[in-house]
């Protein structure tokens, strides 16, 4: 930049030769402050100290090596191979070859073999071609051929070969397409072979006359001449837009701080294009609790396309955009050493006997999971009740709707296996909350402890849930200056030992209950002060925390207490309880720390048929809360949707919504599911969903949200007529919510 101008983005073009490029850059740094280098670079330029390279484009194919100061926005060679191999698997490729011209031919060949093996694509051979050697003799008459490393003359050879052999498909790197774009355009435009020249990129179509991409729309506005619409110019434009987006967010711009930005923010979204995740933490050894690998590449949504689409944007993609996981199977997985093989043979007999015995035990135990024999039935005997709930489940469903169904199913399976193991009784399950009854207080405490251990050691197959929890904590820290995130800022090595996957809170209380047998479910239910206190205890806990009341703790023998790691918390005031309750924290996972108890939380007891005298809070009780604007909107939409259905049909429609959103059904005034009751259920759903909508929309301006966040957030789009109707309704005053309720017929 220039003296006194600190709020501008200066770009300087340097013309040099490959041999002089590194020296030219060094000379430039002696005269000017060089923060970053963009565009085409030589290999030795990347070794220049105190310089950050943003999306460097190399003239010769190279595998990516982690350099913290090199940030790749375009797909790396490895990413392209991964996406292209996935495409070949999907079309049933029967024969693949590779022809490589590079100083790293051997290493690139190994990468090709590994990637194709991952997708079970047969690889016939990998051949190395010397620089300057003719390509014609390397191309067969058929099959799928990776040609990695091209010269100007090679393009014409490929065009003629594809025109001559219709069974041949050639796959090239996008960097070669971008660098030799003019040559490709002349050689392939109007030929039939362009349909079988294939490459992969994360760029939208640069010459689409009616683009849907915001990046391309702005690109065309900046460059009105279609002759300038090339891959290289779009790459430069997208990089410039990225810099325009991130530089204002940096207090001080320098080479190191620029690189730090990518690794600190992890992921960046500009004009609908997402880059990341970037990570500068080195890989841990295989088999560690949390595999973390350094990553300086961030291309996402990489699609496979033919050269014919380059000339005609209406031609469909060969493969829809995907973000490669870059995870590979261990080629030695399953292989046994001689000693291991001997051990397996010797232990087979014992293993068979052990499995047989274990199978008998599990069959008996699982048969009793909902067996009423395990239910406490004597009203004169104390019952220990456990309430569990997944922390931030609604937010997790909003962030990961495709993932949470499997995660919650796993959560249910793990809890039920422990219920069977400890001879406990599953009273009921609503959404992701469990109510469990135990005859033994010690069995209940052990069950809750082992639940935390089981969850933290389970292989969830993703780190997305953990990332979301940490993000939620950081967002709360921004809103509340007094809040210190207990896990978000932990070192990864520490975090993976303490936390993993879903976080479940649990509350345990022991006491006498009113016990009733439900003729509909054929199961037992528990009422009175004991379930209320257990529910309130659970509600006060944080995710991953187990709270035990003094009543439960002192129900344990001295020997049983000695086997537990419990920390006294002292008297805790619970909502609706006149006196503070003595509380203990069960340290199931040693080393965990938690935020302050959630004493300001309202309780929604799983037992939705509890007596009103129990004092349990319910949003759908007789004293209705005021419907927010969002809730009124939701209620009107639901009313309009179900208005044409009969009462039994409405029941079938609304029950799944209640289960998914964890909405407790209001108490029935009669026995039938009539129109009035349907209206009450709709109102409960609207209240719950309205809270989420208000929470999501209060923190962000929709227009400012990245596209990826818009897809993950909850929004309702309304017509102008419906909005006017809502506004008229709300202008009627306090009775507006009742008016909305009356329209639900």
UniProtKB/Swiss-Prot annotation:
Residues 1-341 are extracellular. Its main location: membrane. Binds 1 Mg(2+) ion per subunit. Its EC number is 4.6.1.1. Its cofactor is Mg(2+). Residues 384-538 form the Guanylate cyclase domain. It holds the Pfam family Guanylate_cyc. The chain crosses the membrane at residues 342-362. Mg(2+) binds at residues 389, 432. Residues 363-745 are cytoplasmic. SMART domains: CYCc. Glycans are attached at residues 15, 50, 189, 312. InterPro entries: A/G_cyclase, Adenylyl/Guanylyl_Cyclase_3/4, Nucleotide_cyclase. One of its GO terms (cellular component) is plasma membrane. GO terms for molecular function: adenylate cyclase activity; ATP binding; metal ion binding. CDD domains: CHD. The keyword Cell wall biogenesis/degradation does not apply. Keywords: ATP-binding, cAMP biosynthesis, Cell membrane, Glycoprotein, Lyase, Magnesium, Membrane, Metal-binding, Nucleotide-binding, Receptor, Transmembrane, Transmembrane helix. Disulfide bonds: none annotated. PANTHER family: ADENYLATE CYCLASE, TERMINAL-DIFFERENTIATION SPECIFIC (PTHR43081:SF1), ADENYLATE CYCLASE, TERMINAL-DIFFERENTIATION SPECIFIC-RELATED (PTHR43081). Belongs to the adenylyl cyclase class-3 family. This is Receptor-type adenylate cyclase. It comes from Trypanosoma congolense.
């Amino acid at each position: 930049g220039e003296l006194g101008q600190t709020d501008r983005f200066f770009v300087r073009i340097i013309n040099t030769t490959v041999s002089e490029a590194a020296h030219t850059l060094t000379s430039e740094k002696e005269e000017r402050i060089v923060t970053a280098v963009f565009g085409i670079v030589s290999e030795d330029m990347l070794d220049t100290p105190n310089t950050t390279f943003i999306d460097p484009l190399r003239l010769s194919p190279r595998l990516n090596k982690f350099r913290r100061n090199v940030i790749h926005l375009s797909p790396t060679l490895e990413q392209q191979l991964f996406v292209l191999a996935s495409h070949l698997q999907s079309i049933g490729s029967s024969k693949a070859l590779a022809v490589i011209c590079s100083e790293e031919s051997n290493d690139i060949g190994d990468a090709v073999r590994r990637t194709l093996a991952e997708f079970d694509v047969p690889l016939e051979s990998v051949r190395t071609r010397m620089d300057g050697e003719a390509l014609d003799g390397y191309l067969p008459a058929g099959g799928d051929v990776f040609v990695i490393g091209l010269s100007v003359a090679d393009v014409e050879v490929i065009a003629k070969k594809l025109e001559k052999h219709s069974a041949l498909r050639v796959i090239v790197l996008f960097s070669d397409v971008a660098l030799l774009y003019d040559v490709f355009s002349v050689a392939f435009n109007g030929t039939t072979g362009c349909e079988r020249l294939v490459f992969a990129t994360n760029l939208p179509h640069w010459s689409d006359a009616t683009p849907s991409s915001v990046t391309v729309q702005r690109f065309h506005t900046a460059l009105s001449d279609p002759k300038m619409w090339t891959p290289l110019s779009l790459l430069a434009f997208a990089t410039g837009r990225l810099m325009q987006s991130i530089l204002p967010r940096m207090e001080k711009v320098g080479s190191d701080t620029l690189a730090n930005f990518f690794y600190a923010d992890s992921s960046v979204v500009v004009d609908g294009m997402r880059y990341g995740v970037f990570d500068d933490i080195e890989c841990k050894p295989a088999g560690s609790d949390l595999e973390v690998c350094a990553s300086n590449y961030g291309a996402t949504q990489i699609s496979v396309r033919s050269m014919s689409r380059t000339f005609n944007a209406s031609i469909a993609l060969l493969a829809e955009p995907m973000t490669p996981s870059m995870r590979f199977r261990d080629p030695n997985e399953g292989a046994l050493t001689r000693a291991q093989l001997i051990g397996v043979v010797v232990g087979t007999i014992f293993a068979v006997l052990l499995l047989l015995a274990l199978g008998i035990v599990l069959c008996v135990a699982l048969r009793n999971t909902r067996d009423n024999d395990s239910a406490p039935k004597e009203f004169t005997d104390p019952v220990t009740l456990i309430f569990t709930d997944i922390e931030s489940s609604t937010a997790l469903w909003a962030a990961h709707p495709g993932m949470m169904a499997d995660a919650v199913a796993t959560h249910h399976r793990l809890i039920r296996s422990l219920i069977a193991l400890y001879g406990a009784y599953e009273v009921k399950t609503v959404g992701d909350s469990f109510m469990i009854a135990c005859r033994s207080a010690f069995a209940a405490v052990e069950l809750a402890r082992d639940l935390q251990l089981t969850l933290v050691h389970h292989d969830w197959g993703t780190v997305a849930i953990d990332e979301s929890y940490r993000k939620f904590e950081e967002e709360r820290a921004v809103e509340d200056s007094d809040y210190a995130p207990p896990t978000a800022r932990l070192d990864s090595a520490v975090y993976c030992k303490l936390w993993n996957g879903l976080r479940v809170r649990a509350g345990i209380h022991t006491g006498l209950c009113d016990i009733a047998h439900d003729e509909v479910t054929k199961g037992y239910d528990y009422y009175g002060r004991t379930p209320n206190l257990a529910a309130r205890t659970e509600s006060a806990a944080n995710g991953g925390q187990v709270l035990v009341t003094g009543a439960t703790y002192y129900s344990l023998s001295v020997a049983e207490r000695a086997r537990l790691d419990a920390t006294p918390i002292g008297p805790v005031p619970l909502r609706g309880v006149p006196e503070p309750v003595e509380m203990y924290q069960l340290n199931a996972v040693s080393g965990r720390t938690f935020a302050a108890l959630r004493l300001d939380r309202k309780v929604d007891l799983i037992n939705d048929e509890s007596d009103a005298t129990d004092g349990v809070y319910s949003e759908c009780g007789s004293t209705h809360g005021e419907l927010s604007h969002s809730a009124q909107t939701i209620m009107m939409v639901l009313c309009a949707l179900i208005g044409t259905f009969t009462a039994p049909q409405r029941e079938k429609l609304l029950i799944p919504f209640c289960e998914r959103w964890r909405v407790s059904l209001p108490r029935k005034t009669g026995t039938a599911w009539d129109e009035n009751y349907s209206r009450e259920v709709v109102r409960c759903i609207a209240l719950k969903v309205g809270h989420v909508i208000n929470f999501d929309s209060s923190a962000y301006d929709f227009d400012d949200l990245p596209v990826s966040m818009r897809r993950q957030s909850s929004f309702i789009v309304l017509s102008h007529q419906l909005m006017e109707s809502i506004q008229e309704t709300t202008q009627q005053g306090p009775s507006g919510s009742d008016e909305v309720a009356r329209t639900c017929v």
